[in-house]
Amino acid sequence: GSSAIAKVTRHDVVIAPHAVHHIFPIDTLMGDLSVQGEAEKLIVDRPDVIFHLAAIVSGEAEANFEKGYQINLDGTRYLFEAIRKAGGGYKPKVIFTSSIAVFGAPFPDAIPDDYFTTPLTSYGTQKAICELLLADYSRRGFMDGVGLRFPTVCVRPGKPNLAASGFFSNIIREPLAG
């Protein structure tokens, strides 16, 4: 069935501005999922749907091995564990943003669903591990998870960052800046 959105909760390490007028309440929480205990704060209200977009970008994950695993893997694992431990039949829909970085080159023009993962970077490895965790937690009935492999997730404002996919942001951002 379908139902109206009752509330949206945003959670990030940095609070981004959002429109003042919207048709449903938007709560904003600040915190770091890679810190144990932080994910439980999100699960208290038992959201029906969780969009998990948290990660550091590919170039930064490659440059700082420990930080990449802490944020990209541990943060995801802590979130999944908070969901599992909530118990009481709680089983949210979890949409996990993965990456085409799980595939090593060369790969075909059209990548089938069953194409094997052979990441060439730490970032790709972290995303591949998280995909396996998502599949296992879903298989065990702790969540209804789906992973989406994108070439990029959003256009980032400001100066370019270390993301390998940063050129996508540049394509949009540069013309807008004049």
Named regions from a protein language model:
Residues 11, 50-56, 94-100, 148-150:
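SDR active-site strand-loop-helix element
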Residues 126:
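Active-site helix of classical SDR
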Residues 33-71:
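NAD(P)H-binding glycine-rich loop region in Rossmannoid oxidoreductase-like domains
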Residues 135-178:
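NAD(P)-dependent short-chain dehydrogenase/reductase
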Residues 21-22, 60-67, 105-109, 159:
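Conserved catalytic-core motifs of eukaryotic protein kinase domains, centered on the activation segment
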Residues 1-49:
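N-terminal Rossmann/SDR dinucleotide-binding element
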Residues 28, 68, 94, 145-148:
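Hydrophobic/aromatic anchor residues within beta-strands of the central parallel beta-sheet
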Residues 77-121:
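Conserved Rossmann-fold NAD(P)-dependent oxidoreductase catalytic core, especially the SDR/UDP-sugar
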